[in-house]
């Protein structure tokens, strides 16, 4: 067993990190020695300052264990600082579900981490707990309203919100609630989503102030009356108390990297289910405090990056000046369906199909108007000829290429990437949205499916078609769409690797997130409450007699 906290011996007091980016002691709230909340007043105080440039970090379709996007983003920010510029990396807060489930932590690794990593991966400053509480307060209020006479006439079968928990637990996906001895409540089907996939999390990440937060929470659609009129959270009068529960959660969290540069970690929406980027208030604050903000969008360009452009940028005016597309030899071989231990002497002749996946992601970023650097996250067993093949391919595609060794060497291993990103950020073209606000929802879905995924067409289920009619009736067709699908493929089938052609995207359901202001489009077998695998990560975590975490 080994300690997973030794790297944290380099930690500096968070007040010193705050000082480096121009924050006074009265502008942060300490959560212990190494974590702090940033005051929302910063945006008013720094209003006259020029906004820093935004660098968007994305990837190709990943393997189940990720491709080092977070490690690369952290290393890139550290490298930009090392070159003499001021940079802050902004990231999502890790969810306990993946940390204790399959993927493990989401704080980078090796010489390129955010710290204190174990605190961040566990309860951190309690933001996700607050989101869970606010979400479940709303759910409790709905059932309580029905129990006490149902003045609004809510149809229990029409309730659209689900309870939330920050844990992978498949047994809670579909449940029955309302069983009671007094038989006054409504027995109905319900379920749980993981907290980071809840609409409350999306609302938190898209809100800029307490008034904005409360308004969005009040607009959450909770269900319909028996005569099919919509019911919102504000009709139950709990949106104020929900906002109160989120009072501190709205403030971004300040931590540090393994080289003692600033990192703002705030919000945690999943990218395959939700919109997949840290809060806009965190990025806005980082822009006022630095010259370059490195933002990570979850999973590949087909998910996190697409949603950053079409949801986050559209709503916030935060436009990236350049993009970094993270790739690994391992992932390319995966997309070429080459097993890691297949006995092949070289993968040079066998990753061409994998390069097709990279090609599509490069095309996607070009479509969205982003100048791009492909960053190869280097592993020790990567062969020089494999790296050169990828380099040559990128040159043919007309994009920059750089090898990243942030995990091993920290900022020193990403200096070339940082230099190329800085240079490219001065060349930014106009951002292109994939669809327009005025497009019909069906048209928006088809544009993303055909342009970004490469689908031939889209097939809508009966449930999805009925929701399209509901969207028209509620007059929310102007909302952007939040595509919800597998992260492992450009299609909705996780087994369809590489660059699939002539496939049909299956839209199974559509959800109206009226508070967040977008439409969730469920594709394939996507599930909002993950389950644990047989050998899940929590089986390898422990604590010693001194309270130090250990990894087995």
From Swiss-Prot:
Pfam families hit by this protein: FTHFS (PF01268)
Record keywords: ATP-binding, Ligase, Nucleotide-binding, One-carbon metabolism
HAMAP family for this protein: FTHFS
Lineage: Bacteria, Bacillati, Bacillota, Bacillota incertae sedis, Caldicellulosiruptorales
Entries under CDD domains matching the protein: FTHFS (cd00477)
Catalytic activity of the protein: (6S)-5,6,7,8-tetrahydrofolate + formate + ATP = (6R)-10-formyltetrahydrofolate + ADP + phosphate
Binding of ATP, residues: 63-70
Broad enzyme group: ligase
InterPro entries in the record: Formate_THF_ligase, P-loop_NTPase
Gene: fhs
UniProt similarity note: Belongs to the formate--tetrahydrofolate ligase family.
Protein EC: 6.3.4.3
Pathway it works in: One-carbon metabolism; tetrahydrofolate interconversion
Gene Ontology molecular functions: ATP binding; formate-tetrahydrofolate ligase activity
Organism whose genome encodes this protein: Caldicellulosiruptor bescii (strain ATCC BAA-1888 / DSM 6725 / KCTC 15123 / Z-1320) (Anaerocellum thermophilum)
Protein known as: Formate--tetrahydrofolate ligase
């Amino acid at each position: 067993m080994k300690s997973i906290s030794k790297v944290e011996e380099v930690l500096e007091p968070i007040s010193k990190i705050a000082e480096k980016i121009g924050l006074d002691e009265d502008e942060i709230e300490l959560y212990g020695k190494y974590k702090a909340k940033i005051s929302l007043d910063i945006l008013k105080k720094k209003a006259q300052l020029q906004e820093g440039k935004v660098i968007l970090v994305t990837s190709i379709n990943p393997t189940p264990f990720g491709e080092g996007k977070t490690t690369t983003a952290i290393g890139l920010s550290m490298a930009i600082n090392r070159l003499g510029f001021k940079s802050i990396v902004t990231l999502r807060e890790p969810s306990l579900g993946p940390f204790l489930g399959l993927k493990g932590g989401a704080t980078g690794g090796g010489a390129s981490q955010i710290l204190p990593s174990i605190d961040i991966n566990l309860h951190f400053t309690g933001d996700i707990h607050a989101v869970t509480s606010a979400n479940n307060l709303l759910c409790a209020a709905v059932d309580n309203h029905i129990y006490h006479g149902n003045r609004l006439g809510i149809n229990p079968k029409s309730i659209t919100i689900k309870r939330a928990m920050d844990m992978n637990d498949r047994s809670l996906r579909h449940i029955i609630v309302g069983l009671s001895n007094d038989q006054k409540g409504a027995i109905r089907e319900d379920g749980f989503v993981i907290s980071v996939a809840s609409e409350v999390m999306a609302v938190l990440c898209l809100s800029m102030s307490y008034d904005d937060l409360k308004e969005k929470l009040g607009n959450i659609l909770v269900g319909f009356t028996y005569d099919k009129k919509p019911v919102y959270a504000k009709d139950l009068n709990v949106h104020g108390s929900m906002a109160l529960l989120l009072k501190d959660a709205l403030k971004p969290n300040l931590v540090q990297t393994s080289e003692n540069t600033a990192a703002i970690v705030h919000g945690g929406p999943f990218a395959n289910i939700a919109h997949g980027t840290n809060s806009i208030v965190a990025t806005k604050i980082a822009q006022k405090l630095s010259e370059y903000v490195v933002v990570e969008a979850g999973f590949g360009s087909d998910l996190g990056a697409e949603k950053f452009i079409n949801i986050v940028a559209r709503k916030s005016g935060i436009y990236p000046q350049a993009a970094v597309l993270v790739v690994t030899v391992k992932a390319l071989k995966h997309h070429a369906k080459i097993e890691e231990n297949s006995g092949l002497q070289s993968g040079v002749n066998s990753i061409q199909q994998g390069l097709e996946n990279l090609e599509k992601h490069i095309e996607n970023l070009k479509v969205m108007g982003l100048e791009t650097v492909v960053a190869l996250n280097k592993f020790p067993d990567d062969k020089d000829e494999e790296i050169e093949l990828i380099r040559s391919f990128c040159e043919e595609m007309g994009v920059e290429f750089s090898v990243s060794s942030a995990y091993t060497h920290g900022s020193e291993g990403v200096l070339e990437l940082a230099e190329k990103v800085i240079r490219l950020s001065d060349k930014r073209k106009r951002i292109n949205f994939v669809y327009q606000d005025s497009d019909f929802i069906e048209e928006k879905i088809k544009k993303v499916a055909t342009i970004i995924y490469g689908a031939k067409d889209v097939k809508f289920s009966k449930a999805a078609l009925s929701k399209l009619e509901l969207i028209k009736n509620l007059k929310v067709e102007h909302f952007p769409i939040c595509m919800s699908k597998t992260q492992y493929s450009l299609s909705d089938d996780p087994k369809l690797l590489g660059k699939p052609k002539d496939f049909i995207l299956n839209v199974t359901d559509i959800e109206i997130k009226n508070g967040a202001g977008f439409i969730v489009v469920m594709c394939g077998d996507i599930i909002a409450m993950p389950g644990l695998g047989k050998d899940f990560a929590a089986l390898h975590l422990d604590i010693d007699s001194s309270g130090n975490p250990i990894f087995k």
